[in-house]
């Protein structure tokens, strides 16, 4: 299952259809922090994050961490938060054909995995956790 057309549509909607691809959805050398600045970024931040959430829940669990990370800044997005969203778009540019694959003949099994990062957020020491379930070796959440 793949949503290449949807990826093309959202890249075009946010003027990222000709962007250069990157190999990961998050730049781990950049730490985003909340801002109390009165001005917000002049970009469709919430609309973009919503479009990414739809894609994430349907066929792209590989962007779940990145989308969850940028969604923390929905209340008062700043330029650096918008840059992080655009990085996810750049990752999608290079992985348009990625999706979930159910192969015929796979044994019907169901597995679950989880992980946690305790107090890993440098701004407020909040913890993060995540999980995924595999059905016939394909992620379903």
Model-derived features: positions:
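Long, low-complexity, charge-biased intrinsically disordered regions
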Residues: 1-141
């Amino acid at each position: 299952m793949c949503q290449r057309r949807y990826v093309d549509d959202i890249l075009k909607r946010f003027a990222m259809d000709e962007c250069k691809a990157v190999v990961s959805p998050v730049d781990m050398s950049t730490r985003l922090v909340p801002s109390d600045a009165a001005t917000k970024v002049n970009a469709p931040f919430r609309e973009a994050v919503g479009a990414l959430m739809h894609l994430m829940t349907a066929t792209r669990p590989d962007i779940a961490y990145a989308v969850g990370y940028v969604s923390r800044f929905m209340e008062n997005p700043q330029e650096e938060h918008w840059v992080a969203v655009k990085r996810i778009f750049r990752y999608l540019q290079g992985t348009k054909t990625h999706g979930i694959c159910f192969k015929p003949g796979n044994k019907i099994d169901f597995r679950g995995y989880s992980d946690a990062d305790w107090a890993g957020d440098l701004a407020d020491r909040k913890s993060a956790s995540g999980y995924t379930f595999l059905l016939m070796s394909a992620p379903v959440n």
